[in-house]
Every structure is written in structure tokens, then in C-alpha cells.
Amino acid sequence: MASRLLRGAGTLAAQALRARGPSGAAAMRSMASGGGVPTDEEQATGLEREIMLAAKKGLDPYNVLAPKGASGTREDPNLVPSISNKRIVGCICEEDNTSVVWFWLHKGEAQRCPRCGAHYKLVPQQLAH
């Protein structure tokens, strides 16, 4: 048992010595090109990068962000984007409600939630692709 511990300690010491540079100082490795930890913008690739760049411009091409709530009245309905003529919508009605009221929303005039009376309106949206 003791020999196994000594062998392990010797291996760790050898690795530490190999990690040191020729001057005896520990070699430094940089994570980012400028040194330090890279930012999210430097590290993001693919779809994540596209979303971050669009968010800087104030856009949400993939509907990642929560929709902006309106007052829900007939004059100022909640706008629901859709690529078709109808879409199923879920209304929570009240903050502490534990169930969701689902109903179909069709293109045209604003429609009301059957339970709470909040108004929703379907608006056309193009795909980001």
C-alpha cells in the first residue's frame, strides 16, 4: 500500500517538473488570443453565434426570447406570430393558475380567451431560413 502511494507521488512530481520551462518557471498557457478567459462572443459558433449577433441588433429570428406582452385588450391584443393561417395558443389567465387554457387562434380579427377574456391576434411571420 505504501509503495503504491510513493509511486503515485513520484509520478505527480515528475509531471510537475516536465511542466516547468527551461528557466524553471511554470509554463503559462493562454485560453484566448488576448490572454485570459474568452468571452461568450469569442467562443460562440453556429446557431448560438447567429442568435447572439441578431440579439445585438434587437432581432429574435428563432423566437428564443419570451414574447412581449401587451395589455390583451381588443385595441391592444397580444400578437402571436405564425407561418400558417391558424395556431394553437395557451393562456395561463392568472399568475397563480396551475392549468393552461388551450384554444385555436385563426387569422383575422383578434380573438378572446374563453376563460379570462384576454385578446390575441395572429400575425404573419416568415421563417428565418
Swiss-Prot record:
GO molecular function: cytochrome-c oxidase activity; metal ion binding
GO cellular-component term (any): respiratory chain complex IV
Transit peptide residue numbers: 1-31
GO-annotated biological processes: cellular respiration; mitochondrial electron transport, cytochrome c to oxygen; respiratory gaseous exchange by respiratory system
Primary localization class, coarse: mitochondrion
InterPro entries: Cyt_c_oxidase_su5b, Cyt_c_oxidase_su5b_sf
Residues modified to N6-acetyllysine: K68, K86, K121
Keywords, in A-Z order: Acetylation, Membrane, Metal-binding, Mitochondrion, Mitochondrion inner membrane, Transit peptide, Zinc
Pathway assigned to this chain's UniProt record: Energy metabolism; oxidative phosphorylation
Binding positions for Zn(2+) per the UniProt entry: C91, C93, C113, C116
Highest rank taxon of the organism: Eukaryota
Membrane topology qualifier: Peripheral membrane protein
Presence of the UniProt keyword Chaperone in the record: no
Annotated compartments: Mitochondrion inner membrane
CDD domains, A to Z: Cyt_c_Oxidase_Vb
SUPFAM superfamilies according to UniProt: Rubredoxin-like
Coiled coil: none
PANTHER family per record: CYTOCHROME C OXIDASE SUBUNIT 5B, MITOCHONDRIAL
Described function: Component of the cytochrome c oxidase, the last enzyme in the mitochondrial electron transport chain which drives oxidative phosphorylation. The respiratory chain contains 3 multisubunit complexes succinate dehydrogenase (complex II, CII), ubiquinol-cytochrome c oxidoreductase (cytochrome b-c1 complex, complex III, CIII) and cytochrome c oxidase (complex IV, CIV), that cooperate to transfer electrons derived from NADH and succinate to molecular oxygen, creating an electrochemical gradient over the inner membrane that drives transmembrane transport and the ATP synthase.
Record's subunit section: Component of the cytochrome c oxidase (complex IV, CIV), a multisubunit enzyme composed of 14 subunits. The complex is composed of a catalytic core of 3 subunits MT-CO1, MT-CO2 and MT-CO3, encoded in the mitochondrial DNA, and 11 supernumerary subunits COX4I1 (or COX4I2), COX5A, COX5B, COX6A1 (or COX6A2), COX6B1 (or COX6B2), COX6C, COX7A2 (or COX7A1), COX7B, COX7C, COX8A and NDUFA4, which are encoded in the nuclear genome.
Protein family membership: Belongs to the cytochrome c oxidase subunit 5B family.
Protein name: Cytochrome c oxidase subunit 5B, mitochondrial
Native organism: Homo sapiens
